[in-house]
Every structure is written in structure tokens, then in C-alpha cells.
């Protein structure tokens, strides 16, 4: 199963759910499609990073940097999409708490540890790490190795959201629509903070001795988690509003990128427009989720079955795709002259080959345990 997306069971309850998405006792193809698109966007973003991040994390100055802004300004919605899908399926909790944690943490943590070890071995072959570095990396798995590897930071955040599920579920079961909108409204305000901080570095109680200022508990990915539940319960945006928010958010993101490209030197400063919990990403994510949720096709042909198969293997694809990106970039980057060739071609090759590798691995004994599929 695609446990990156936090699916408890495909036979989940049908209380006030979006009729386009909900088909009791059946896979929801619209969300399978959304998972696969999110996987593609993850890979696209990680391919693109090589073109705007220098080894010292400064902004490079090559002529195609403006084009990178146009090519990459949609991709950061992928992580919020995964979180919204998780909230759609997991909230509110409908099973015993201990059983929930055992199921979730087992299916997430075992593959995570296995792939951390595999990446530690991979780094010996790919970048020349020593055996001592390998053992040091393995020993560092309980600390923060996932972040040091790079893309596995996501797992820590996902586990944190799982820990939140039994806490917020009782409130979600009894709250009114207006109350839910009130929470989401405060959270939406916090998505302006990355831009507010450009003028006011510390607001609403922020200071070095206070790690939890006024709106701290309303910030971050928990808002996307609840937004996924909100769409299930009350429905998605209209197509018209979704398109307006999606196009408007994209153009705003590109504009901020182009403006800051000439004014900042560090990647962290340039990426402010690509922050997952920024207002522009929030609007685009909400809009894109709403659009795809309206797909009525049930995937009843070979292509649809492949989409569902990809969705089932998406957690393992998330782990392995960096290895495939490195392979295809080393193989193809010199033969493809420009960024607008390199990024799409390397992304497509990595996207397809990641699925093939995981599909082959899924045939091995006990693969479900360490692949998370």
C-alpha cells in the first residue's frame, strides 16, 4: 500500500464524504491518481534542485536560472498533497489507539530503517564513503540520518502527524463546520508568516527563549492534515475557483522567485516562495487536490490499473527515487544541452525506472515488510 499517504484501510467509513472520491469498499482512483502525480512532482523537484543549488548552498548564476523558476514553481505542492491524502483517510480515528500506532509505526519505521541502511551502503559506492562512515551513518539512524540523507525528512514529520491523530480526532468528530473553518482560518493566516518575517523577523511572541509563540500550535503540516479531512466531510472547491487559485498561486510564486533571484545569494532565501507551508503553496495545494478529486474515471483499463499499482508502491518509490535520479543525471546530463531538456527527461526516466525497480523488489520474499507496500 502507499503508506507514505497514510492509508489505514480502503474500507474506511463513508460519513459525509465527497461523493466524487468516496466509493465504499473500493479503491478511490482519484486519490490513487493524486498520489502518483505527487510522486512525479517529488521527483521533478529533486531533479531540479541540481540546477539551483550549489554545493555550498548558494544560488548559482548560470543563464537558465530564471527558467528554473517557471519549471519548478508548481512542484512543492507534492508534500502537502501527501499530507492531505493522509488526513482524508486517517481522520478521525476509527480504531483502537494501540492498534493504530502499531500498524502505522510498523509499516513506516521498518522500511525507513531498512532504506537508511541501504543508503548508507549506497553512499560507499556512489560518493566513496568509507566503511567507518557507513557504520557511523547506521549508528546515526535514531538521531537524524533521514535528514542527512535528504528526502527522508518527510518520515519524521509524518510520524509526528500520526501521533496527533488520537488527540484531534475527538474534536473533529463533534466540531461544527464553522468551528473547523475557524481553525483552518487561523492556520491559513500562519501561512503568511514566511513573508511577514521578511519585514518583521519576530512577531506574536517569537524570540530566542520562547520556542512556542502565540500561533505555534496552528502552524505547519497539521493544517493540511485537517484540510484533507475537511474536504472529505464538506466537499472540494469548484472547478472555477480551483483553477483561479492554481493559476494565480503559480504566477505569484514565479513572480516572487524572479524578484528574489536578483537580490539573494543563499538557497534558503531564494526558496521562500517554495516553502511548503507558505500561503501560495497552500492555495495551490487546496486547488489541485480539489481538481483531481473531481476525476470520475475509475481507472478501469490497463493505464488505470498501472496508476493504482504505482500508488500501491509509492512509499518505496519515495525511498528509491534519489538513487535513480543520480543514475540518470550522470548518464544523460552531458548529452542534453539545456535545463528545459534535462529536467523533464531525467524526471520521466527516474519516475518510470523507480516504479520498475520497486515492482521487481516487491516480488522478493517478505518485501511488503521492508518496502512498505
Where do the language-model regions lie?
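Alpha-helical transmembrane segments and terminal signal-anchor/GPI-anchor hydrophobic tails
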Residues: 237-305
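Aromatic-anchored segments of alpha-helical transmembrane domains
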Residues: 44, 116-117, 185-198, 247-261, ...
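Interfacial loop-to-helix transition and helix-capping segments at the boundaries
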Residues: 67-80, 142-157, 195-223, 256-286
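Extracellular/periplasmic helix-loop-helix junctions in multi-pass membrane proteins
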Residues: 262-272, 326-345
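Membrane-helix interface motif
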Residues: 50-54, 124-132, 196-202, 259-263, ...
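Membrane-interface junctions at the ends of membrane-embedded or membrane-associated helices
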Residues: 93-99, 170-178, 232-243, 291-306, ...
Amino acid at each position: 500500500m502507499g503508506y507514505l499517504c497514510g492509508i489505514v484501510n480502503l474500507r474506511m467509513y463513508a460519513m459525509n464524504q465527497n461523493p466524487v472520491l468516496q466509493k465504499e469498499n473500493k479503491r478511490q482512483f482519484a486519490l490513487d491518481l493524486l498520489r502518483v502525480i505527487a510522486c512525479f512532482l517529488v521527483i521533478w523537484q529533486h531533479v531540479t534542485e541540481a540546477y539551483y543549488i550549489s554545493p555550498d548552498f548558494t544560488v548559482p548564476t548560470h543563464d537558465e536560472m530564471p527558467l528554473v523558476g517557471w519549471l519548478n514553481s508548481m512542484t512543492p505542492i507534492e508534500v502537502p498533497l501527501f499530507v492531505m491524502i493522509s488526513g482524508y483517510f486517517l481522520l478521525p480515528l476509527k480504531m483502537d489507539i494501540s492498534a493504530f500506532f502499531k500498524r502505522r509505526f510498523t509499516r513506516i519505521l521498518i522500511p525507513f530503517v531498512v532504506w537508511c541502511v541501504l543508503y548508507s551502503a549506497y553512499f560507499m559506492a556512489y560518493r566513496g564513503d568509507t566503511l567507518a562512515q557507513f557504520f557511523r551513518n547506521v549508528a546515526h539512524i535514531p538521531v537524524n540520518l533521514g535528514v542527512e540523507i535528504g528526502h527522508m525528512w518527510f518520515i519524521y514529520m509524518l510520524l509526528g502527524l500520526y501521533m496527533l491523530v488520537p488527540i484531534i480526532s475527538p474534536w473533529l468528530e463533534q466540531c461544527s463546520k464553522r468551528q473547523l473553518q475557524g481553525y483552518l482560518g487561523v492556520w491559513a493566516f500562519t501561512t503568511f508568516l514566511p513573508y511577514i518575517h521578511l519585514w518583521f523577523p519576530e512577531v506574536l511572541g517569537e524570540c530566542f527563549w520562547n520556542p512556542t509563540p502565540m500561533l505555534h500550535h496552528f502552524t505547519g503540516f497539521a493544517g493540511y492534515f485537517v484540510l484533507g479531512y475537511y474536504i472529505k466531510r464538506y466537499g472540494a472547491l469548484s472547478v472555477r475557483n480551483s483553477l483561479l487559485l492554481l493559476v494565480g498561486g503559480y504566477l505569484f510564486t514565479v513572480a516572487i522567485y524572479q524578484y528574489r533571484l536578483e537580490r539573494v545569494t543563499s538557497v534558503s532565501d531564494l526558496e521562500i516562495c517554495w516553502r511548503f507551508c507558505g500561503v501560495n503553496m497552500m492555495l495551490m495545494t487546496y486547488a489541485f487536490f480539489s481538481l483531481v478529486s473531481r476525476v470520475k474515471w475509475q481507472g478501469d483499463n490497463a493505464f488505470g490499473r498501472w496508476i493504482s499499482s504505482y500508488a500501491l508502491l509509492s512509499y518505496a518509490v519515495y525511498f528509491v527515487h534519489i538513487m535513480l535520479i543520480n543514475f540518470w543525471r550522470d548518464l544523460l546530463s552531458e548529452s542534453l544541452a539545456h535545463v528545459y531538456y534535462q529536467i523533464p527527461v531525467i524526471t520521466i526516466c527516474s519516475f518510470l525506472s523507480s516504479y520498475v525497480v520497486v515492482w521487481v523488489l516487491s516480488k522478493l520474499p517478505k518485501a511488503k515488510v521492508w518496502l512498505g507496500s
